[in-house]
From Swiss-Prot:
Pfam families: P-loop_SecA, SEC-C, SecA_DEAD, SecA_PP_bind, SecA_SW. CDD domains: DEXDc_SecA (cd17928), SF2_C_secA (cd18803). This is Protein translocase subunit SecA. InterPro entries: Helicase_ATP-bd (IPR014001), Helicase_C-like (IPR001650), P-loop_NTPase (IPR027417), SEC_C_motif (IPR004027), SecA (IPR000185), SecA_CS (IPR020937), SecA_DEAD (IPR011115), SecA_motor_DEAD (IPR014018). NCBIfam families: PRK12904.1, secA. It comes from Neisseria gonorrhoeae (strain ATCC 700825 / FA 1090). GO terms for biological process: intracellular protein transmembrane transport; protein import; protein targeting; protein transport by the Sec complex. May bind 1 zinc ion per subunit. The lineage of its organism: Bacteria, Pseudomonadati, Pseudomonadota, Betaproteobacteria, Neisseriales. Part of the Sec protein translocase complex. Interacts with the SecYEG preprotein conducting channel. Has a central role in coupling the hydrolysis of ATP to the transfer of proteins into and across the cell membrane, serving both as a receptor for the preprotein-SecB complex and as an ATP-driven molecular motor driving the stepwise translocation of polypeptide chains across the membrane.
Length: 916
């Protein structure tokens, strides 16, 4: 009550922000005539002027009015589009690191140019993030002429791009790409073994298009770079036969072997189910008699069994995945798009492959991972645009510290949002949907039908075919035709059936998208220039009449075939209609068989239905029902927010560890001299080993000197008689022994370094350290996954799972770091340097030299080899010998950065130059 009164008196936070921004809009508008009077050359020169002013100490905020005015005028000249006042507000919101909520059709792509241009002037790079490669390429292509006119370069990151091209794209002032590509490049950059192989610069400023889709819908899906793990493919096939023998329970307390919790998307095996499964696996010979699935030795069997149960019970064909070219391809539940190349983890993908009888590919082991939540928080400044952010404003603020500002529309919204119609059964609902479509089609009103799954879109398509209504289907299976179908969805009488419309990225123009049609004609090589001009002229003349006819028919009509779990997705579907003041309408058709009503609103809604008791085919429209459904959606949104928050809380633990590892790794990559770090690592490793067998402040009787001597010999090749030291000097203690051992190791290491050269040893140290960190980090990630999967069981012991996870993860990380240091010290001190004479090799013609990029030899393999063997195997695979002296005898000098004459493709300093 008091809050509402305060808002009426002082205005809301959003109103106050808009009032401030409008003052800046007035300053920008005051510069418009001045900018229009400039020649093209003078307007272009403004970019260099702004950069100089920034170098002289001015801030981006200080030059904002002028920069925005320049960008608007350049856009008018180059693109033929002038920014509206509300678009200027949107640009300022983005520059301030906030989220701009703008309705569909309000020109978000053009709005971004203002903030992007201003921030690109700082020279630190700007990333424009989109949801797919098509939109990244399209938006970059549209806006590149504007940025080029203003003296800025544009790059595009798309999948399958080579590293060199990626480096060039990131070096540009403005880089377009998808959230996946930006995230994966960050992970790959932290796996390189040469700093010059990195592609990204510092993460400075990002503008995220469809920010709710990327930062919320995909927040629970981590980006993972993985390699194949050793796995038994046959076990998935065997386990696939088990679920049909188990009985599904109707309720959690019912009789049966397992229960499916659809809300939590989990399968729970009952005690009876465990016993039944153990009997089946014992009969198959996978489980020993009287053995238990709970035992540590059988954890893999349990893992495979649960994956098979989830595959059979929770993941359904044409809803969660499709089969394409003999492969399981995941369907994005939020957008309906195919996610080629993505695979479910934890053996689930293999279990689904076994269920569908397609080729089973090996399970992957995580090499590096990060969530979008933690990746995008790495940017110095982050902003975003979307048509629907207000319902998730609290989450944006609490997780990303992003405030949402609702930008007013340029013209008032004319769309009519009609009441939901609710039916008893899905059959009645779809009959009503077809009837509504038929009526719209008769009067020439275009219709967009939104479904939540491929299965439902194909069902609607079959019903429309039966009714003789021509239509287009837009789902994951029709991805290639997507833009064309959406562009023409506003034509007279057009019927378009689509899975979730989130992130489609193409406006539906009433009367059809004229630009798409004219572009298609211009691209048609079978037509002459005269024919193209004639067809384009005819199109332009006929378009206005068609546009007017659609306007008279009521504009685009939206039909939702069920409510999504999130109100935001429903609003995105509605938002396709009524763009830029156009007329339009929307209505949702629901049934009590819909998942949302069945799972979250059934009891109260069913009671209301029984009281109203309509006849078959008669819809219910009641405010109480609508409120009940919205309450169910809010409940689901709250549950999903809690799940995303929980994912973040757990990932924050791994994220802090990731920062430490990546920071240390980067220091090793970029440091010219890592001698001090190596000395510290050797010292720590020896000290830790001595402390293990000679604990500080302990009695001499507690020391285990023989084992210490054995470990020193095995780990560091130190043959020391410590017992004789103790006999010779009664006053000696653990610290004295550490100092003697460290001195001995340092002397031996200095001798090795002198033998091979300081630079060669530094390169070798760097490679060993990076491989050790990567290998141990990979194993640590797997251990963290296992810890995470079972940590919830601690709650049964009255312990807080999150606190337990943090505590154990910290201990594991300490062990990881100590293990890395010990491994590095052990390996490098154990390496033996031998110098054997090497014979000359016959000189190869230049044309036969091949550049090959082979994997480095495994560290474990290096341990048992001499240095000469190592060089022969790693740098001269064919076993031939090579002599730098032989070349010098023929008067040929090989410089350090020249290709090595042995034909390995490596630089001489990285190959046989190490022996020279």
């Amino acid at each position: 009550m008091l809050t509402n009164i305060a808002k009426k008196i002082f205005g809301s936070r959003n109103d106050r922000l808009l009032k401030q921004y409008r003052k800046s809009v007035a300053r920008i508008n005051a510069l418009e005539e001045q900018m229009q009077a400039l020649s093209d050359a003078d307007l272009q020169a403004k970019t260099a002027e702004f950069k100089q002013r920034l170098a002289d100490g001015q801030t981006l905020d200080g030059i904002l009015p002028e920069a925005f005015a320049v960008c608007r005028e350049a856009s008018r000249r180059v693109l033929g589009m002038r920014h509206f006042d509300v678009q200027l507000i949107g640009g300022m919101v983005l520059h301030d690191g906030k989220i701009a909520e703008m309705r569909t059709g309000e020109g978000k792509t053009l709005v971004a140019t203002l903030a992007v241009y201003l921030n690109a002037l700082a020279g630190k790079g700007v990333h424009v993030v989109t949801v797919n490669d098509y939109l990244a390429s399209r938006d970059a292509g549209i806006m590149e002429p504007l940025y080029n006119f203003l003296g800025l370069t544009v790059g595009v990151i798309i999948s399958d791009m080579q590293p060199f091209d990626r480096q060039n794209a990131y070096a540009a002032d403005i880089t377009y790409g998808t959230n996946n590509e930006f995230g994966f490049d960050y992970l790959r950059d932290n796996m390189v073994t040469d700093q010059y192989d990195k592609v990204q610069r510092e993460l400075n400023f990002a503008v995220v298009d469809e920010v709710d889709s990327i930062l919320i819908d995909e927040a629970r899906t981590p980006l993972i770079i993985s390699g194949q793990a050793d796995d038994n493919i046959q076990l998935y096939q065997i386990m696939n036969t088990v679920p049909p023998h188990l009985v599904r329970q109707e309720t959690e307390e019912g009789e049966g072997d397992y229960w499916v919790d659809e809300k939590a998307h989990q399968v729970i095996l009952s005690e009876t189910g465990h016993e039944h499964a153990e009997q089946i696996l014992t009969q198959m010979g996978l489980l020993a008699e009287n053995d238990s699935l709970y035992s540590a030795a059988n954890i893999s069997l349990m893992h495979h069994l649960m994956a098979a149960l989830r595959a059979h019970s929770l993941f359904h064909k044409d809803q969660h995945y499709v089969i394409q070219d003999g492969e399981i391809v995941i369907v994005d539940e939020f957008t309906g798009r195919l996610m080629s190349g993505r695979r479910w983890s934890e053996g689930l993908h293999q279990a689904v492959e076994a269920k569908e009888g397609v080729e089973i590919k090996r399970e992957n082991q995580t090499l590096a991972s990060i969530t979008f939540q933690n990746y995008f928080r790495l940017y110095t400044k982050l902003s975003g645009m979307t048509g629907t952010a207000d319902t998730e404003a609290f989450e944006f603020q609490s997780i990303y510290n992003l405030e949402t500002v609702i930008i007013p529309t340029n013209r008032p919204v004319q769309r009519k949002d009609l009441n939901d119609q609710i039916f008893r059964s899905a059959e009645e609902k779809f009959e009503a949907v077809v009837k509504d479509i038929e009526e719209c089609h008769k009067r020439g009103q275009p219709v967009l039908v939104g479904t939540t799954s491929i299965e439902n879109s194909e069902l609607v398509s079959r019903l429309l075919q039966k009714a003789g209504l021509p239509h287009n289907v837009l789902n994951a299976k029709e991805h290639e035709r997507e833009a064309l179908i959406v562009a023409q969805a506003g034509k007279v009488g057009a019927i378009t059936v689509a899975t979730n419309m989130a992130g489609r990225g193409t406006d539906i123009v009433l009367g059809g998208n004229l630009k798409h049609q004219t572009d298609a004609i211009r691209a048609d090589e079978t037509l002459s220039d005269e024919e193209k001009q004639a067809q384009i002229a005819a199109l332009e003349n006929g378009w206005q009449a068609e546009h007017d006819k659609v306007m008279e028919a009521g504009g685009l009509h939206i039909i939702g075939t069920e409510r999504h779990e999130s109100r935001r997705i429903d609003n995105q579907l509605r938002g396709r209609s009524g763009r830029q003041g156009d007329p339009g309408s929307s209505r949702f058709y629901l049934s009590f068989e819909d998942p949302l009503l069945r799972l979250f609103a059934l009891d109260r809604a069913a009671a209301i239905l029984n009281r109203l008791a309509p006849e078959r085919g008669v819809a219910i429209e009641h405010n109480l029902l609508t409120r009940q459904i919205e309450g169910a959606q809010r409940k689901v949104e709250g549950r999903n927010f809690d799940m995303r928050k929980q994912v973040l809380e757990y990932d924050d633990v791994a994220n802090e560890q990731r920062k430490v590892i990546y920071s240390q790794r980067n220091e090793i990559l970029t440091s010219k001299d890592i001698g001090d770090l190596m000395q510290e690592i050797r010292s720590d490793a020896v000290s830790d080993l001595v402390d293990t067998y000679m604990p500080p402040d302990s009695m001499e009787e507690q020391w285990d000197i023989p084992t210490l001597e054995n470990r020193l010999a095995a780990e560091f090749r130190l043959q020391e008689d410590i017992q004789s030291w103790l006999k010779a000097d009664n006053a000696i203690d653990g610290q004295d022994i550490k100092e003697r051992l460290i001195e001995r190791i340092e002397n031996e290491y200095a001798a090795k370094t002198e033998l091979v050269g300081k630079q060669a040893m530094a390169d070798f140290e760097r490679n060993v350290m990076l491989q050790a960190i990567d290998n141990q980090w990979r194993e640590h990630l797997a251990a963290m996954d296992y810890l995470r999967q079972g940590i919830h069981l601690r709650s049964y012991a009255q312990k807080n799972p999150k606190q337990e996870y943090k505590r154990e993860a910290f201990t594991m990380f300490q062990d990881l770091w100590n293990g890395i240091k010990f491994h590095i010290a052990s390996l490098l001190t154990s390496v033996q340097i031998e110098q054997n004479p090497v014979a000359a090799v016959e000189e190869q013609p230049v044309g036969n030299i091949q550049s090959i990029h082979s994997e480095s030899p495994d560290i474990e393999e290096l341990l048992g080899q001499s240095q000469t063997d190592l060089v022969t195997e790693a740098f001269n695979p064919d076993g031939t010998d090579f002599s730098p002296e032989a070349l010098e005898a023929r008067g040929q000098i090989v410089h350090r950065n020249d290709p090595c004459p042995c034909g390995s493709g490596l630089k001489y300093k990285q190959c046989h130059g190490k022996l020279a």
